[in-house]
Design a protein with these regions (language model features):
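Intrinsically disordered, low-complexity protein-interaction/activation regions
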Residues: 1-157
Length: 157
């Protein structure tokens, strides 16, 4: 629940919905993921890069051709599409460990000709930081330095 003090942050918070798998992505610093309160292994560098790219666009689909070009610096090898699909499958297993076989993915979803991280199931630290920084700036401008300090500290926590 968002209190009145947190209302300014609400549009920028992206978090797990009730009953959904709670996935926290940390991209400020080394890329990490926490699922159900536990850190998880994100796999090899390209797989981590895929997750980072999708995390930068939470809730928005990213086309397969954009992913291929980004992951292989504009020159994807012939097996790139198969590798991308394997990375997606691996990340789905890691991000949704309790998902039944053949059940639709809810965190890393296929969308049209691409993939997206569902904003109802993923929280990204940079969004939380931006929300607190914005609320802190607004509090400072509004003449409330105590609240501003509290927001800035929360953003850095």
């Amino acid at each position: 629940m968002i209190s009145g003090d947190d209302a300014a942050v609400a549009p920028l918070l992206v978090g797990a919905s009730a009953g959904g798998t709670a996935v926290e992505l940390r991209v400020l610093g080394p890329v990490e993921a926490v699922v159900g309160g536990r850190p998880v292994d994100l796999g090899p560098p390209k797989q981590r890069a895929l997750l980072t790219l999708l995390a930068s666009r939470v809730g928005r689909p990213v086309a397969v051709d954009v992913l291929l070009e980004a992951l292989w610096a504009g020159t994807p090898p012939p097996a790139a599409l198969a590798s991308l699909r394997a990375y997606v499958a691996n990340l789905r297993r890691v991000l949704e460990p309790d998902r039944a076989p053949r059940a639709p993915a809810t965190v890393l979803r296929t969308y049209a000709a691409g993939y997206l991280l569902d904003s109802h199931h993923v929280e990204v630290d940079v969004h939380r930081f931006i929300g607190h920084a914005t609320a802190g700036r607004d509090a400072w401008r509004g003449g409330d330095p105590q609240r501003a300090l509290s927001e800035f500290e929360a953003g850095l926590a």
